[in-house]
């Protein structure tokens, strides 16, 4: 059997949009397996400038050439199952998919192991289905029934496609439980990579709160902006996306929206903010981990991956405060609680809490895991 260094590998991902957690995973995978070829359905090269993926050769699907696909790739979601099945991966020994939608549905040979790193089952097709319809104004009328039909089809395809995967890896125990619920499959947890070493945690804090996120409905950026607009507390918001204009209209003068910013700017703000505000129910949540690496406490909605990455007050050495409901009142109460006990949240405790999520740990564990799967598959032990 070939050693892993000589194995030909295809890495498959859905899309490369604004740099985020899944893009960091793909970049790390390519560092671990430099011989791998990268396949994505669609990507915007301009979004990858200054990132580790800027110089990476990328093979794309037919969606790449469709109108406005680079900017509004989600419009082509109904075509993505078909598109991912057109990738010809026959020449490769091993396939690794990085999937939050359809990448796990690639077609592989019987003797070709397929390892899928699942960021999440398709949230908008499963547990966020009804919320997605409401927030997208697709909860009534003819368009609503068309959207429901498409999402029904995607759920059927999604479950069917999960059977094409030999081994599931995932980001957290929280997502592993969802994979078991949706696909009836077990998944091994491998926490995603965070470049904690790029942050300093010993810089002076300044008088502003910070939110960093893509502007999509489930991130609840409008909730954060409305809560701070009501209290007048200074808030800086970094990120962009389809909800940006909707959120901007809710912002009062105490809220500063910076739009998309390069990594260096995000790092600078995380190192100076009083606290990060995070309102999403996220499967893992890279930004709260990055904030703690920068010595910045986290005020977060208390569901999902943050329960595994943030030590909530009143525990000893707390690194954050949780709020119990996605409402302005609940968030404002959490901010007040943080301010009342701010001296308890030390930069040193924040940094110590997230050392376990470093890039080197992810890369070491990924290589060992893939090597073990490769050896077992070749000997019939899968």
Q: Model-predicted segments: where are they?
A:
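Active-site donor-binding segments of glycosyltransferases and PAPS-dependent sulfotransferases
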Residues: 35-104
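Membrane-proximal helix-turn-helix segments that form the acceptor-binding/catalytic region
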Residues: 135-168, 176
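Conserved donor-binding/catalytic core segment of Leloir-type glycosyltransferases
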Residues: 196, 200-236
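Nucleotide-activated donor-binding/catalytic signature segment of Leloir-type glycosyltransferases, i.e.
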Residues: 245-267
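Acidic donor-binding loop of glycosyltransferase active sites
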Residues: 271-283, 296
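Short hydrophobic beta-strand element within catalytic cores of glycosyltransferases
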Residues: 297-302, 307-310
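A charged, aromatic-enriched C-terminal amphipathic alpha-helix characteristic of glycosyltransferases
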Residues: 326, 343-373, 378
């Amino acid at each position: 059997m070939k050693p892993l260094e000589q194995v030909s590998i295809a890495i498959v991902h859905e899309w490369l949009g604004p740099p985020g957690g899944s893009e960091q995973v793909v970049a790390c995978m390519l560092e671990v397996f430099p011989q791998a070829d990268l396949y994505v359905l669609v990507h915007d090269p301009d979004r990858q400038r200054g990132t580790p993926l800027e110089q990476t050769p990328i093979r794309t699907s037919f969606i790449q050439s469709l109108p406005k696909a680079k900017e509004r790739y989600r419009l082509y979601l109904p075509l993505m199952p078909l598109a991912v099945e057109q990738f010809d991966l026959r020449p490769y020994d091993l396939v690794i998919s990085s999937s939050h939608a359809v990448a796990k549905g690639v077609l592989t040979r019987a003797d070709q192991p397929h390892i899928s790193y699942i960021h999440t089952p398709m949230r908008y097709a499963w547990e966020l289905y009804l919320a997605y319809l409401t927030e997208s104004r697709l909860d009534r009328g003819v368009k609503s029934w068309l959207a429901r039909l498409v999402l029904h089809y995607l759920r059927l395809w999604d479950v069917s496609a999960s059977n094409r995967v030999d081994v599931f890896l995932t980001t957290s125990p929280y997502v592993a439980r969802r994979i078991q619920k949706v696909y009836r499959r077990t998944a091994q947890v491998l926490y995603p990579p965070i470049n904690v070493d790029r942050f300093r945690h010993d810089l002076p804090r300044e008088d502003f709160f910070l939110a960093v996120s893509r502007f999509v409905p489930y991130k609840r950026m409008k909730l954060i902006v409305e809560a701070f607009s009501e209290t007048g507390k200074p808030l800086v918001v970094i990120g962009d996306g389809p909800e940006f204009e909707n959120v901007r209209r809710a912002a009062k003068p105490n809220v500063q929206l910076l739009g998309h910013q390069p990594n260096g700017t995000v790092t600078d703000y995380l190192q100076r903010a009083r606290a990060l505000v995070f309102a999403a129910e996220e499967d893992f949540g890279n930004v709260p981990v990055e904030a703690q690496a920068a010595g910045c406490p986290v005020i977060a909605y208390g569901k999902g991956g943050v329960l595994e990455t943030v030590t909530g007050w009143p525990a000893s050495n707390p690194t954050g405060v949780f709020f119990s409901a996605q409402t302005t009142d609940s968030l404002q109460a959490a901010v007040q609680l943080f301010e009342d006990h701010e001296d308890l949240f030390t930069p040193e405790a924040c940094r110590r809490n997230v050392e376990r999520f470093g890039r080197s740990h992810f890369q070491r564990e990924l290589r060992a895991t893939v090597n073990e799967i490769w050896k077992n598959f070749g000997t019939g032990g899968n």
